[in-house]
Amino acid sequence: MRRAGCATVEAVHTDPTSLTFRSAEEADWPAMALITATGFGVWRSEETVAVWRSMMPADSAVVACDGDDVVGTALFLDLELTVPGGAVLPMAGVSMVAVAPTHRRRGALSGMFDELHRRMNAYPIAGLEASEAEIYGRFGYGAATVWERLEVHRRGARFHLAVPDPGGVRIVRPAEHRAQLEDIDERWRRRTPGGLHTPARLWDEILADREGSRNGGTPHYCLLHPDGFAFYRLHGSDEKTTVEVTKLAAATAEAEIALWRVLLGLDLKEIVGVHTHPGNVLRYLLTDPRLVRTTNVEDGLWLRMLDIPAVLQARTYSADLSVVLEISDEFLGRGGRFALQVRDGHAHCAPTTADADVHTDVSVLGSLYLGAHRASSFATAHRLRCNDSQVLAALDAAFAVDVPAELGYGF
């Protein structure tokens, strides 16, 4: 793996609750699997676990123990996150976080997170998906992407006359076109804030298409365009009338339109569903946008800045900006006062003693980073304080993005 090094830490930490926190050992993995299956209600196969373990740096898993018993688990993966403008940051992807129901509210999660974040010194940023939205803000994580669940009643769907029909889509067996799928996915993620590099072992797992990953659906079908692809499954009773798009990656607008034309042209199917970013183009393609229904909206990727200046300097910006940020960070103490200067899309950020224009915490900064949320919204909610409306408008303009943020894949 590209980043195998982590900070050296003590082997065991003990807290007042009598739980101990230490590095996970090989013998702990069966117990870790039991704890996570109990927490999430899903058993992962040994083959699937091996794939995710191949993405872990050394010493990146910790366990909480009550005596000899493992009662909690947490780890992080070595991921590559695309940020606005196309730069890529190494990201510690926190995963497999679970505590036994017998040991709730005894400090297991806090103890594991203390231990886990000590090991992230090689990373400027960390990310996770939150099973419960109220948990992770206190650790400095903020929701940075949004999933919108769309359903289309396809029988009445008609495309506007102005919408082109690019063509070029084929129905293929995905394993026979792996190289092309990998290339398209890499092009897509390089332009998409929130995109993640998919390593070879994870592609092996995707194409293995194990029954445990199907959520009751059929094996994957694949639509392939020179600049995009869509994976989908069929769900329902014997007739399988619901199409569930599990991944749509388009490197061009033409490819996205071409794929939607085929998906909405699947005869004998009633509903096409997809999880996508807010503002998806689909409604604008159809003569009757009411056929596209939003059935759910929820957070996707949560981000936590570990090196604030480095992370803010990594992305590009949509407008010039000169602002002093006062960032609080109660969990790790990595906040402070920072001068952020943006000229021609590029930023310089450094600690300063100047008076602050904006006061907020590191979780809000994480939510703003990929452009999915506006500073003015947090100001309205009193989670960001700024007494100058022009500065607030400048923040909104600078952090805005042309390409909507979208999490590359779940981890």
Regions found by a protein language model. Name each.
Residues 63, 69-78, 93, 98, ...:
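Conserved beta-strand in the GNAT
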Residues 89-101, 240-251:
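Conserved acetyl-CoA binding element of GNAT-fold acetyltransferases
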Residues 27, 34-47, 186-198, 267:
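Helix-loop element at the rim of GNAT/NAT acetyltransferase active sites that forms part
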Residues 113, 117-130, 267-278:
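Conserved GNAT acetyl-CoA-binding A-motif
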Residues 94-118, 253-264:
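Conserved acetyl-CoA-binding loop-helix of GNAT-fold acetyltransferases
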Residues 121-150, 279-295:
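Conserved active-site alpha-helix within GNAT-family acetyltransferase domains
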Residues 1-17, 84, 162-411:
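Intrinsically disordered, low-complexity, positively biased terminal segments
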Residues 39-83, 194-221, 311:
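Active-site rim helix/loop that mediates acceptor-substrate recognition in acyltransferases
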